[in-house]
């Protein structure tokens, strides 16, 4: 009872403090108190509810039966919208604060909200090596189920709360992407409800134009209601090698070399300064040396990026065996390194042992309680960006990131980009090795001004035929956006499928003016 009483006393004192100082002041200057006392317990309740629900639904096999009825309900909503005169654009009815994007779309308030309650794993077919899922299924659900039966996704993006729909309509990447590509490249079929209320299934051989146009389209070609995704046999552990590298030229050469080696199942780099990095390569295995086993996902363990940094500080190479699911979600507890700005003492051993089992807070709840003042502060003094550039431009790109924003650590993740139709493809006719450069944190460049600095970075990315992930703040104008992305197939399908009066253009959903 004593911990519960202590927590209750702390909560009471916090409420008195809020009454004295005002909620907005506390949310800005003592945000960690609010997060620890309220958001962490709420996040834990959310996680337990959705995990139990997903397990029960799948075990009782009710999801496929309910799925068809739910799809018919979506079709009915779309047809009713048409009968009422199609006066506004449509969008999903999922609240903007529930998405992993740091911003909330303004269009939710003005568009017709179509309710899409599709959050179940429908089928796992180990003979065809396919999992069929609904769009709101999360990566946490997928790993919990698939790893328990000995399977996994070839590309399993990091954070637990990322949804299949978001990873298809936006994009997704992981340290296995140098072998398999982006999340869209492991998908074999999409099922959608179109602007006229009709249902369509598309694959590389059936309705192929739509299949290739859907990724990155942000729900502007139709409503995704299911997807089929490749699965591969899983092993128990990842045998992970840590290699500190110094000197930018050496870092780029080593990272490029490891990314080209297909025997590496996983390749990842953490750049701690322009001249210091740790490059990690891993392979799946069923055997582990007990003395080198590291269950990094346990709540009391150090945050992964801090653990990796120790290899740099001590200038030594390392070898560890990490349980597969722990590896997949190695950055989840610290939200990469974003949590250190929210709970500055979050990696302290005492905090980890006492409260680490509640970490991390839900990104959706952090957004919901952000407030306008804090949102503006984040916009001007915080960067969250993923830029995808050709591997051959890595050294030039890192210099540009250093000069324009100066944020560290930087996440480095290689991926192969096939030459396929759609919004995103290489400049030539052959597949090309690209890299995701992820910058998350407070810029340390002098006189940082969000708009001008980000526009400068976006200009560089366009110049090397790179791409910007669309969850992030986009400062490009429409012309610049379509210079970055190939809209030929996308615009053709929008006209063919009657999307122009049903859905906004993708730029109008992701541009800076469309979000707050």
Swiss-Prot record:
Its cofactor is FAD. It is found in: Endoplasmic reticulum membrane; Golgi apparatus membrane. Residues 1-22 form the signal peptide. Pfam families: FAD_binding_4. Residues 23-31 are lumenal. SUPFAM superfamilies: FAD-binding/transporter-associated domain-like (SSF56176). The chain crosses the membrane at residues 32-52. It comes from the Eukaryota. Residues 58-234 form the FAD-binding PCMH-type domain. Residues 53-516 are cytoplasmic. Highly expressed in brain and adrenal gland with moderate expression in liver, lung, spleen, prostate and spinal cord. Low expression in heart, uterus and prostate. Undetectable in blood cells. In the brain, strongly expressed in cortical regions, substantia nigra, caudate nucleus, hippocampus, medulla oblongata and pons. In brains affected by Alzheimer disease, expression in the inferior temporal lobe is substantially lower than in the frontal cortex. FAD binds at residues 163-175. GO terms for biological process: amyloid precursor protein catabolic process; cholesterol biosynthetic process; cholesterol biosynthetic process via desmosterol; cholesterol biosynthetic process via lathosterol; male genitalia development; membrane organization; negative regulation of cell population proliferation; plasminogen activation. One of its GO terms (cellular component) is nucleus. It is a single-pass membrane protein. The record marks 122-123, 383-384 as: Cleavage. Changing residue 480 to K: In DESMOS; decreases production of cholesterol from desmosterol. Pathway: Steroid biosynthesis; cholesterol biosynthesis. Interacts with DHCR7; this interaction regulates DHCR7 activity. It is linked to Desmosterolosis: Rare autosomal recessive disorder characterized by multiple congenital anomalies and elevated levels of the cholesterol precursor desmosterol in plasma, tissue, and cultured cells. Catalyzes the reduction of the delta-24 double bond of sterol intermediates during cholesterol biosynthesis. In addition to its cholesterol-synthesizing activity, can protect cells from oxidative stress by reducing caspase 3 activity during apoptosis induced by oxidative stress. Also protects against amyloid-beta peptide-induced apoptosis. This is Delta(24)-sterol reductase. It comes from Homo sapiens (Human). The lineage of its organism: Eukaryota, Metazoa, Chordata, Craniata, Vertebrata.
């Amino acid at each position: 009872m004593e911990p519960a009483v202590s927590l209750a006393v702390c909560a009471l004192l916090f409420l008195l403090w809020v009454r004295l100082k005002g909620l907005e002041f506390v949310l800005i200057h003592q945000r960690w108190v609010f997060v620890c006392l309220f958001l962490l317990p709420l996040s834990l309740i959310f996680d337990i509810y959705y995990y139990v629900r997903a397990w029960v639904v799948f075990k009782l096999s009710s999801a496929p039966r309910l799925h068809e009825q739910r799809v018919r309900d979506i079709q009915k909503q779309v047809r009713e919208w048409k009968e009422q005169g199609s006066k506004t654009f449509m969008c999903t009815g999922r609240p903007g604060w529930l998405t992993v994007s740091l911003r909330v779309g303004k269009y939710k308030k003005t568009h017709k909200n179509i309710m899409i309650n599709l959050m179940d794993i429908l089928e796992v077919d180990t003979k065809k090596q396919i999992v069929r899922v609904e769009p709101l299924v999360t990566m946490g659900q997928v790993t919990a189920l698939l790893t328990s039966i000995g399977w996994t996704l070839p590309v399993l993006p990091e954070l637990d709360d990322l949804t299949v729909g978001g990873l298809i309509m936006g994009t997704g990447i992981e340290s296995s992407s140098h072998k398999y590509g982006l999340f869209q490249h492991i998908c074999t079929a999409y099922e959608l409800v179109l602007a006229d209320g009709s249902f369509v299934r598309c694959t590389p051989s059936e309705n192929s134009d739509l299949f290739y146009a859907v990724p990155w389209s942000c729900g502007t070609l139709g409503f995704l209601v299911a997807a089929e995704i490749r699965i591969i046999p899983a092993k128990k552990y990842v045998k992970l090698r840590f290699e500190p590298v110094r000197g930018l030229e050496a870092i780029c050469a080593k990272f490029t070399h490891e990314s080209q080696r297909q025997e590496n199942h996983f390749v990842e780099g953490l750049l701690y300064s322009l001249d210091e990095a740790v490059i990690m390569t891993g392979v799946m295995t069923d055997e582990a040396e007990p003395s080198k086993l590291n269950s990094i996902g346990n709540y009391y363990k150090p945050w992964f990026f801090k653990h990796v940094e120790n290899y740099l500080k001590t200038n030594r190479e390392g070898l560890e065996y990490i349980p597969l699911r722990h590896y997949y979600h190695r950055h989840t507890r610290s939200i990469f390194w974003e949590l250190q700005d929210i709970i500055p003492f979050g990696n302290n051993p005492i905090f980890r042992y006492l409260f680490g089992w509640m970490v991390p807070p839900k990104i959706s709840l952090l957004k919901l309680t952000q407030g306008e003042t804090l949102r503006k502060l984040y916009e001007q003094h915080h960067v969250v960006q993923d830029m995808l550039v050709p591997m051959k431009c890595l050294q030039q790109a890192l210099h540009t990131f250093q000069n324009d924003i100066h944020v560290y650590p930087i996440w480095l993740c290689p991926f192969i980009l096939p030459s396929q139709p759609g919004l995103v493809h290489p400049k030539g006719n052959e597949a090309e090795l690209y890299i995701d450069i992820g910058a998350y944190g407070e810029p340390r460049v002098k006189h940082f001004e969000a708009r001008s600095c980000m526009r400068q970075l976006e200009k560089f990315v366009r110049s090397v035929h790179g791409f910007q992930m669309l969850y992030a703040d986009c400062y490009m104008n429409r012309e610049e956006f379509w210079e970055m992305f190939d809209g030929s197939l996308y615009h053709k399908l929008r006209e063919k499928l009657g999307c122009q009066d049903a859905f906004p253009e993708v730029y109008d959903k992701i541009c800076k003016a469309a979000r707050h």
